Amino acid sequence: MREITVYNTMTRQKEVFNPVTPGEAKMYVCGVTPYNHPHIGNARPFVTWDVIRRYMKHVGYKVTYVQNFTDVDDKIINTSNGEGVSWDTIANRYIDSYFEVMDALGVQRADIYPRVSTHIEDIIAMINTLIEKGYAYELDGDVYYSVDKFEHYGELSGRTLDDMEAGARIEVDGRKKNPMDFALWKAAKPGEPYWESPWGNGRPGWHIECSAMSQKYLGTEFDFHGGGSDLIFPHHENEIAQSEGCSGQHPAVRYWLHNGFITINSEKMSKSLNNFFLVKDILEQYSPDALRYFLLSTHYRSPLDFSDERLEEANKSLERLSTAIENLLYLEKCEPGQCEDAQRLLEKAKTFEEEFEMAMSDDFNTALATSSMFGLAKEINIYYQAMTSKEGVVCQEAIAEVKRIFKFMTDVIGVLEKAWEGNTGANAAEYEELMQVILSVRQTCREQKQWALADCIRDRLSEIGITIEDSPQGARWKKREV
């Protein structure tokens, strides 16, 4: 297998990926709290991990991908009380919304989507173990984790307990042994969902769910844990304390990966600034591929500034890729024969393929990888223009290999899947026949020097998303995908 290096937040350096189980890659990514429709900040980690998963599979790893839903949470409870409906009605509504927009963005479904509400027994069992081992204590129906008991606390975030206490905004509770102790179980309150437990009715704290569910499905040690950089502290720091305190396995996670923040026109995204964008609203103006490519155009660890201008640029960039795909599909149908130009194109394609894989193997650098993808697209389009400007044959073996390489790139990045289908579908034959009639009429107009009418046909077709291209071999049409 190709060697892969990843930046590990825990060690603050790049490391060669060495899986727990040879040939396998087990990953857990913190999912959404479904109390509203997903926003642009939610989309980035899931698109990022979708590409990581795709590439790991390409390299040859058997990937197990778990992503949770925090369907029991204060925000969900507040929303349900405000609307006068049950908490699970809210959670199910926005889980459905999550799948709708992520499916549109081409995010492949995780292998497992555990929910807090269906793993209460696992959570209670883990809390019991932590109490038995002296890492947690019960107070009037609440259960807290004692951070002083865990020697590695603060290693992920690079903070000492003294630093945390000095800079933390925490709810003052004089009952706790340490102000930084965090809740594993919360005693029931009026108007909130609750479950029976050894400490009385209540519900889980925020952090314990991910420890319980990741260990259940991936074991006490697994390869990747991901999420936004805002989760490093306290969520992921607390996860480590819980998971390692329970199992005794150190480390519980070999590689911690965190994506950077998204800003809106260089400002932090927030509802108070009225720059809080939902994915579903963005997709009303831009194609899913444009948004997906935009999210991947910058290295996942770097900040990403969202703006209409950047999305417009992404849209135009994808048009170049779409044109290259259309040109490859056209070249496949050309007369076969020996062609040195096609062989030279193939050699360039192999170079771009190697550069693409090197970039993806270096901490999943999609920004650099996509530059190789666009480099190959440019060469394909140059070759197409040269071939269609003269009568000639095409080396189909070379073109088939170029197509394989280019499709591999777009498949890993996860864009333009439909473009590869070409003009197919239930009515493809009838559509093609109709277009040939239109092209024939337009050609007659050109032969009779009715230029205005010929141009009118071309322009009207363009208005409905169909591009006409003229060449010495005749006109061809293609439907724009973006």
What do these predicted ranges mean?
Residues Y61, Y135, I466:
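Short phosphate-binding/catalytic loops that engage adenosine nucleotides
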Residues K268, F276-V482:
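Structural preference for alpha-helix termini/caps and helix-kink/transition segments
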Residues T11-K14, V20-G106, Q473-W477:
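N-terminal, positively charged nucleic-acid-binding surface of large information/translation enzymes
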Residues S80-W87, D111-S117, G228-S229:
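The substrate-binding groove and active-site-proximal loops of carbohydrate-active enzymes
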Residues F69-D74, I95-Y98, Q108-I123, G141-F150:
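Short, glycine/charge-rich beta-strand/loop segments that flank catalytic centers
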Residues M1-Y35, F46, D50, T64, ...:
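Alpha-helical recognition segments enriched in aromatics with Gly/Pro capping
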